[in-house]
Amino acid sequence: MKSFTIAALAALWAQEAAAHATFQDLWIDGVDYGSQCVRLPASNSPVTNVASDDIRCNVGTSRPTVKCPVKAGSTVTIEMHQQPGDRSCANEAIGGDHYGPVMVYMSKVDDAVTADGSSGWFKVFQDSWAKNPSGSTGDDDYWGTKDLNSCCGKMNVKIPEDIEPGDYLLRAEVIALHVAASSGGAQFYMSCYQLTVTGSGSATPSTVNFPGAYSASDPGILINIHAPMSTYVVPGPTVYAGGSTKSAGSSCSGCEATCTVGSGPSATLTQPTSTATATSAPGGGGSGCTAAKYQQCGGTGYTGCTTCASGSTCSAVSPPYYSQCL
């Protein structure tokens, strides 16, 4: 019995680790920019301490030297998958019953490449929770993460039309609540994208800070979703008036439904001469450029830089999908 229990626990832990995920790609008005302007975390593991600076943009992130160009009022589509570099729809975007809300914030910064996330953030999107009349517990209800899984990891986010132009960080986040019944159990999966927004707006939305916007005891963070639920209090501020929401349980639309890797338009960003970031476009990498420490250097379908900066080595982190300079 003891050996069975240990084996069962080991299997559960393995399943838990396999279900971790990362926001790792971006579409802009249906054009695939891949992972060129995302700060990829060092792993697909979650942040659990809401008081840590890691709650801003995750742990050990690389900072690309490029920024994705976005017009105010356009739609970007964030994309999440369990394994780095794997954009297949064969697996859930975030598995293991990791149910919870999906939220997106933006932060106006002087330079999206160097910004550390300490400036204020405003929420521009959320897809949280809706009651399933046929269900008995929160597990049965509709959640933002279930919508992610239904849409191959994709979720459409409107960039507010009235915000002032300039550089922004866009922070995409999932809060997984499957073990959130005890303090510190909620799991936060986030990535920050580096954007340059163009337009003629002048709005400067009110902001919150990370850390600070969340408390470990917030009712939407400290919660038992395995019991019947009649309501859910979404963490953080309300969505900015120029942003958008999606009703949990609704169908895929726009790029969520139609954008397919390799079968539509894609874009390659021009790298500075001191390239430190790999690109996902054909001909944009290989041995002729250098990837900075913690950046991708190989994996299935990868065509970017394969040589790592001095002091780091290209290591298979999640073979065959993803190799990283470590």
UniProtKB/Swiss-Prot annotation:
Pfam families xrefs: AA9, CBM_1
Residues annotated as signal peptide: 1-19
Annotated residues for binding of O2: H178, Q187
GO biological process, one term: cellulose catabolic process
Details of cofactor binding: Binds 1 copper ion per subunit.
SS bonds (residue pairs): C57-C192
Similarity field: Belongs to the polysaccharide monooxygenase AA9 family.
Function field: Lytic polysaccharide monooxygenase (LPMO) that depolymerizes crystalline and amorphous polysaccharides via the oxidation of scissile alpha- or beta-(1-4)-glycosidic bonds, yielding C1 and C4 oxidation products. Catalysis by LPMOs requires the reduction of the active-site copper from Cu(II) to Cu(I) by a reducing agent and H(2)O(2) or O(2) as a cosubstrate. Shows no activity on wheat arabinoxylan, konjac glucomannan, acetylated spruce galactoglucomannan, or cellopentaose.
Descriptive protein name: AA9 family lytic polysaccharide monooxygenase B
